[in-house]
């Protein structure tokens, strides 16, 4: 009986101790669960916020300097200017002169003079320096067969355009032929058999080539039928450009 009494009393003590341990563990767990969110809220309340929660202030001067350098815009490099002078060039367009002559316009529409080139109807195109030049010329022509009673009636016409040079190192002697082109046209008679003019015809004589020229030499155009030149836009022009 004494032994049984001791065993019962000891079992009750062990059960009571287990219950106390369980209560203590549960209390600690609840305390821990409540402490974590409270701590997080306290930290968030103390952190300075700006611009949607991003931290912009820092106590480290070095970090501020690095942040400023990160947003620094580098200056754009300006392209180097091309200091080399342009090559001499000229483009002249045909213009009528008094007395049914062929003149040239140097400043209107597409015409131009660059890098020291000069022009006058009396002296022609003057080039400013020695070099290899590409010369070109195109002359448009138009006309019609004369009336039936006139002579020559229906005869072929040879149209010729030429480029010459004179002056400068070449000297004041006879101008030298540089380039030339020609075209033969046979005007059509009046198809109705009347004694009037034939239908209007159009053609052009064009050519170009490389020529070695010296400073001061003058280039000009000579044509065979100035009274037949077509002065419509883009039909008659000549020019030069230095290529070497």
Swiss-Prot record:
Positions annotated as glycosylated: 222
Coiled-coil ranges (or none): none
Keyword Nucleotide-binding: no
Membrane-side (Extracellular) residue stretches: 49-244
UniProtKB keywords: Cytokine, Glycoprotein, Membrane, Signal-anchor, Transmembrane, Transmembrane helix
Molecular function in Gene Ontology: cytokine activity; tumor necrosis factor receptor binding
Location of the THD domain: 88-243
GO cellular component terms, A-Z: extracellular space; membrane
UniProt keyword Glycoprotein present: yes
Membrane topology qualifier: Single-pass type II membrane protein
SUPFAM superfamilies (alphabetical): TNF-like (SSF49842)
Top-level division of the source organism's lineage: Eukaryota
Transmembrane segments: 19-48
Side of membrane Cytoplasmic, spans: 1-18
Pfam families cross-referenced by the UniProt entry: TNF
GO biological process, one term: immune response
Localization in the cell: Membrane
PROSITE patterns in UniProt: THD_1, THD_2
Protein function: Cytokine that binds to LTBR/TNFRSF3. May play a specific role in immune response regulation. Provides the membrane anchor for the attachment of the heterotrimeric complex to the cell surface.
Subunit annotation: Heterotrimer of either two LTB and one LTA subunits or (less prevalent) two LTA and one LTB subunits.
Family: Belongs to the tumor necrosis factor family.
Name of the protein in its database record: Lymphotoxin-beta
The species this protein was found in: Macaca mulatta
Annotated gene: LTB
């Amino acid at each position: 009986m004494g032994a049984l009494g001791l065993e019962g009393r000891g079992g009750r003590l062990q059960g009571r101790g287990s219950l106390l341990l369980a209560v203590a563990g549960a209390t600690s767990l609840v305390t821990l669960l409540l402490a974590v969110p409270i701590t997080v809220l306290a930290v968030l309340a103390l952190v300075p916020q700006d611009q949607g929660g991003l931290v912009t202030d820092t106590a480290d001067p070095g970090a501020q300097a690095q942040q400023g350098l990160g947003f620094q815009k580098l200056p754009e490099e300006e392209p180097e200017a091309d200091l080399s002078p342009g090559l001499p060039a000229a483009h002249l367009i045909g213009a009528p002169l008094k007395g049914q002559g062929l003149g040239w316009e140097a400043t209107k529409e597409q015409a131009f003079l660059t890098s020291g080139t000069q022009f006058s109807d009396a002296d022609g195109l003057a080039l400013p320096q020695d070099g290899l030049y590409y010369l070109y010329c195109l002359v448009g022509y138009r006309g019609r067969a004369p009336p039936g009673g006139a002579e020559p009636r229906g005869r072929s016409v040879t149209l010729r355009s030429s480029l010459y040079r004179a002056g400068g190192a070449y000297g004041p002697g006879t101008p030298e032929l540089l380039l030339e082109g020609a075209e033969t046209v046979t005007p059509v008679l009046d198809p109705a058999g009347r004694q009037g003019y034939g239908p209007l015809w159009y053609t052009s004589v064009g050519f170009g080539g490389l020529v070695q020229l010296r400073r001061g030499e003058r280039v000009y155009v000579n044509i065979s039928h100035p009274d037949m030149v077509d002065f419509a836009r883009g039909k008659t022009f000549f020019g030069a450009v230095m290529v070497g």
